[in-house]
Amino acid sequence: MEAATMAWTAAGVGMALVYWFVWVMGAAEVKGKRAVDLKMGSITNDKVKDKYTQYWSFFRRPKETATTEASAEKVPAFVDTFYNLVTDIYEWGWGQSFHFSPSLPGRSHREATRVHEERVADLLQAKPGHRLLDVGCGVGGPMRAIAAHSGSNVVGITINEYQVNRARAHNRKAGLDSRCEVVCGNFLSMPFSDASFDGAYSIEATCHAPRLQDVYGEVFRVLKPGGLYVSYEWVTTSLYRADNPEHVEAIHGIERGDALPGLRRQDEIASIAKEVGFEVLKELDLALPPALPWWTRLKMGRIAYWRNSLVVRVLTMLRIAPKGVCEVHEMLYETAQHLTRGGETGIFTPMHMVLLRKPVESK
Ligand SMILES: C=C(CC[C@@H](C)[C@H]1CC[C@H]2C3=CC[C@H]4[C@H](C)[C@@H](O)CC[C@]4(C)[C@H]3CC[C@]12C)C(C)C
Ligand SMILES: C[S@@+](CC[C@H](N)C(=O)[O-])C[C@H]1O[C@@H](n2cnc3c(N)ncnc32)[C@H](O)[C@@H]1O
């Protein structure tokens, strides 16, 4: 073979390899987000590293972030930064629903996710014509599943503008934009009128609130009397021991890597709900047996993580992805280890479910 032909062949093979590596290996968990499209929300490429450093220094000591009023007030802004940094990586590596669900034998992760979301609609007894509120809606995976399953209309609220745009685009694509609406705002002070929703839910979102009373109080205000509210809460369980260094490391790791101003205890949730005026109808940790572990999806993905971190490195080198993505990806990888540890030891659950009702006689 002539040298020129050999060079062209080598170049062709090289190009094919890059194509395979980036477009095929870097394909999305759920089609729609590819590694080559990774952005850092509304942060411009030159600011990603700085924003990540700011985020990290704020949440490095998670418990301290909620202790003074001044730092608690900054939490929503840093949560917004966090979601600018992670939203695309979450969509790429996990899908459009940013939460966990118990594994289901013989069913895919996608199906298990949907079942966990439809359970919310069933608990709320949601019907066509109902107006539901999704508190901390992400890019709207649960909202679309719940609207499709129940026939209800859903309004989602998220602090992160980039997520609002992603969610609206997904709603249009799914043909659900006439029944699913997304608003950018703070769930600690919501831009909705009193008694304007038939039902409300929050899936793994209220853990970002420095004081649960504030978000539950707002949900109480916007619900109609008799309206139901379901929440899946991130909490430490009764197995957590504050004098066990391994427990403390796992919980701090979860808080740091998930923008949490300090996890609450499982036994605090119902009393906070009562404090703001709710009746507690049901309370159950959905992670308890016979439910199968929610963390197996994180564990089974070791090879996928390795592949993803390679993809992210190559894309950063090629300047397709912004500088700082590798650091964010590494942080998420470590967080996954802490979450797995939290699940395996039973000291943490991301699905402590409460079903609450605003009393019929309340204003
Ligand atoms: C409710 C919250 C988010 C829960 C989960 C959706 C996310 C928690 C940790 C995330 C991930 C960890 C490892 C990532 C991996 C290194 C990467 O290659 C692909 C994406 C991950 C799997 C990512 C996906 C989302 C999580 C599982 C919190 C924030 C309250
Ligand atoms: C882990 S995501 C869960 C998203 C969605 N519930 C799901 O399961 O896909 C948490 C969500 O809460 C939102 N959030 C956190 N703090 C908020 C605040 N103060 N106001 C409004 N949204 C907030 C985030 O923007 C994000 O959309």
From Swiss-Prot:
Specify the species.
Answer: Oryza sativa subsp. japonica
Q: Which domain of life is it from?
A: Eukaryota
Q: Does the keyword Lipid biosynthesis apply?
A: yes
Task: Work out whether the entry's keyword set contains Metal-binding.
Answer: no
InterPro entries from the UniProt entry: Methyltransf_11, MeTrfase_SMT, SAM-dependent_MTases_sf, Sterol_MeTrfase_C
Q: Please state what the protein is called.
A: 24-methylenesterol C-methyltransferase 2
* Residue ranges crossing the lipid bilayer per the database entry: 6-26
EC code(s) of this entry: 2.1.1.143
Keyword field: Lipid biosynthesis, Lipid metabolism, Membrane, Methyltransferase, S-adenosyl-L-methionine, Steroid biosynthesis, Steroid metabolism, Sterol biosynthesis, Sterol metabolism, Transferase, Transmembrane, Transmembrane helix
